[in-house]
């Protein structure tokens, strides 16, 4: 009767990969030969390693769940045809016919790791002038217990006895071309040519463990929302101690209380009371990099803008800074008393905008009428 690998690890048949890995790690720590030298315990340790080798590999697990034993010598065999054990596609047929399939060779256990990405929030002034930030990232790193090899301390990977280190097995298959010899990856070693009889208890044979690291990232001036900064080799370390992938830091610019960014231009609004200092008086505006004097000329209307050239965001790829656009908003009093209304009428007369009754033309309003409408909330 076939071994019940689920029972060996003490997990349900619908257990997730995470549950299987946790169960193996727990048992491996209890039954490891360095901890418990009892010969019976060592046999039990071999059983949990075999169970984990099958259940942690999707292909082997599928074969096992269908009633096969992927660790047996004949477990990976198959009948002819185009299904399992036969030809997967036309290139397999041509490889078999011309004898090229056996030239594939074993796969390397050392592979490049996956890329990773995190989001980093920065302030507007940091985006404008650049900065340096320390970030924390959670990625896979090389297991220090096995140095990325995946084997328990004191053990090592062994040559696969099924394929004898070739990484592939051959079989005779019948097709419309007749009987041909075809090769495919060894089901026992998955094409690696070696097997790990005793996986590392710390990383469960993966050669990697999760870790939190602190990295320093330099943010150049001019970055915008969505800009990705690449840190080569700082992503996930590869299986078998392979080189790490890249880490991408995606910039997210936080809203500013005063300035709004549109491309590389900055925009802000300056409020000027109608009854305040004369419009031509210079005013000081606090920008991202200090105080700036702006000159609002006489006659400037609400809604007009004053550009400050070169006071925007420096372009990411170099060059001068763009503009800071100052939008002027002229405010009027919310309510007029009798004296204020009289003064406005006098001003309208001086400007020649108050006309006698009967001379008013549709579509034309004097200064007093326009201001009064504004004060009363009418447009």
Swiss-Prot record:
Cofactor: Zn(2+)
Residue ranges, annotated region (Disordered): 351-379
Lineage top rank: taxon: Bacteria
Annotated CXXCXGXG motif repeat ranges: 143-150, 160-167, 186-193, 200-207
CDD domains: DnaJ, DnaJ_C, DnaJ_zf
Name this protein carries in UniProt: Chaperone protein DnaJ 2
Residues where Zn(2+) 2 binds: 160, 163, 186, 189
InterPro entries to which the protein is assigned, alphabetical: DnaJ (IPR012724), DnaJ_C (IPR002939), DnaJ_domain (IPR001623), DnaJ_domain_CS (IPR018253), HSP40/DnaJ_pept-bd (IPR008971), HSP_DnaJ_Cys-rich_dom (IPR001305), HSP_DnaJ_Cys-rich_dom_sf (IPR036410), J_dom_sf (IPR036869)
Basic and acidic residues compositional bias, start-end: 370-379
Lineage start: Bacteria, Bacillati, Actinomycetota, Actinomycetes, Kitasatosporales
GO CC entries: cytoplasm
HAMAP family named among the record's database cross-references: DnaJ
Domain J: residue ranges: 4-68
GO terms classed as biological process: chaperone cofactor-dependent protein refolding; DNA replication; protein refolding; response to heat
Renumbered zinc finger spans (CR-type): 130-212
Coiled coil segments of this chain: none
Domain comment (free text): The J domain is necessary and sufficient to stimulate DnaK ATPase activity. Zinc center 1 plays an important role in the autonomous, DnaK-independent chaperone activity of DnaJ. Zinc center 2 is essential for interaction with DnaK and for DnaJ activity.
Biased composition range(s): Polar residues: 358-367
Keyword terms: Chaperone, Cytoplasm, DNA replication, Metal-binding, Repeat, Stress response, Zinc, Zinc-finger
